[in-house]
Amino acid sequence: MAAETSIRKLPSLSGLRHRRNPLEDNPYFHPSNGFYITPSDVILAQVAYDHSAHSQSRVAYHRAGPRREIMYEPSAVKAAIVTCGGLCPGMNTVIRELVVGLWELYGVREIYGIPAGYRGFYSMKAVKLDPKAVHDWHKKGGTVLATSRGGFHLQKIVDAIHLNGYNQVYIIGGDGTMRGAVEIFKEISLRKLEVGITVIPKTVDNDVGIIDRSFGFQTAVEMAQEAISAAHVEAESAVNGIGLVKLMGRSTGHIALHATLSSRDVDCCLIPEMDFYLEGKGGLFEFLEKRLKERGHAVLVVAEGAGQEMIPRNESQKQERDESGNAVFLDVGVWFKSVLKAWWEREHPDELFTVKYIDPTYMIRAVPANATDNLYCTLLAHSAIHGVMAGYTGFVPGPINGNYAYIPLEEVAQTKNQVNTRDHKWAWVRSVTNQPDFETNVKG
């Protein structure tokens, strides 16, 4: 019996008229059989199955790409582009490619950048954009449009979208931004506004679910190598030296994991998904002492969200939230440096010991995207444009198993991509570092 396939339904605008895709007349495209994506073209969420098992239900998403017919008259489009949340390599590339794609592929001429995140919709003047204005933005770090956290006032934002006549809204942001975008999408639907909305997934932590990866992640891993290499040199050049590197990753340890596997200089990698302990048999201190005796140095990589429950904090710190509503994390790197020094002074008061702490957070996220991420940002931007022009709304474009798809925004906003400490990749980390299996030691 054939497996049943469940295709995730995409929201679409019903009040617009079908029209011929202007790509038919674009001098750089020669549409042939297979060029246009059809409603029956889908991407499977999972490509590996147990062939010996009985029929398994399969989940699929609509494939991204240009449609033979579009739902917008390009001359009537007024598009808004906004960047929200923290910086991430590739933000300017996405903006550039949205502008160039709308202009060159579909002939859209009314394209506006919204400054300073969500609050810019109702409190700042939009910036008119065209290919000439953005031609070199992909070479710059940060976001030329500026960004901010917070400022999410739903009614003010949707009022501004309506009053300014925007009928396409392209939002570049991470998990908090997506939760806000879900509310904007619902309010737009409630008001029955014919506005297409999409979110290009941005998070350097790579914690967006369903898609293969978020843009900027590969650049971040590449930049993290420099910090780890520096920590290794510092540790190796000292007597009983420890190089301590804190990498981004509030709730997931993907950057720390991939940077550890890539560098091969790391002796221990600590991530939010894995609990650890310091004292006693099988603890971190015992492991580090053994490593220092064997090699004279060690390199420790820790994701910013690891060990947060171990850091002492007062009542006000427990309740503290940032403007996006996220819990404020204490600096695990500063705490680690302190407890490592206290441990060594207690156990080996007469021996030399050095901890060199490196926090490359702002260096990593503020750089321009590398070549791989630049190409990825282009594909994401163009996928978003094709989807909105086809009349879809409330979706996220992204690769699933290497193929680009459209995923319902609400589904992505509710999903988190965390490191699976039971799979082969985490086992690979432990085989490279030879670090303890803290979980097994605790249970044992």
UniProtKB/Swiss-Prot annotation:
InterPro entries: ATP_PFK, PFKA, Phosphofructokinase_dom, PKF_sf, PyroP-dep_PFK_TP0108
Residues reported to bind Mg(2+): 175
GO cellular component: cytosol
Gene Ontology biological-process entries: fructose 6-phosphate metabolic process; glycolytic process
Record bears the keyword Transmembrane helix: no
Binding site for ATP: 86, 149-150, 174-177
Cofactor(s) in the UniProt record: Mg(2+)
Catalytic activity, EC: 2.7.1.11
Binding site residues for substrate: 203-205, 248-250, 304, 362-365
Molecular function via GO: 6-phosphofructokinase activity; ATP binding; metal ion binding
Group of enzyme by EC: transferase
Activity regulation summary: Allosterically activated by AMP.
Pfam families: PFK
Catalytic activity: beta-D-fructose 6-phosphate + ATP = beta-D-fructose 1,6-bisphosphate + ADP + H(+)
Residues bearing PTM Phosphoserine: 55
Record-annotated active site: 205 (proton acceptor)
Main location class: cytoplasm
Stored PANTHER family: ATP-DEPENDENT 6-PHOSPHOFRUCTOKINASE 1 (PTHR45770)
Biological function: Catalyzes the phosphorylation of D-fructose 6-phosphate to fructose 1,6-bisphosphate by ATP, the first committing step of glycolysis.
NCBIfam families the record matches: PRK06830.1
Protein name: ATP-dependent 6-phosphofructokinase 2
Taxon lineage: Eukaryota, Viridiplantae, Streptophyta, Embryophyta, Tracheophyta
Encoding gene (name): PFK2
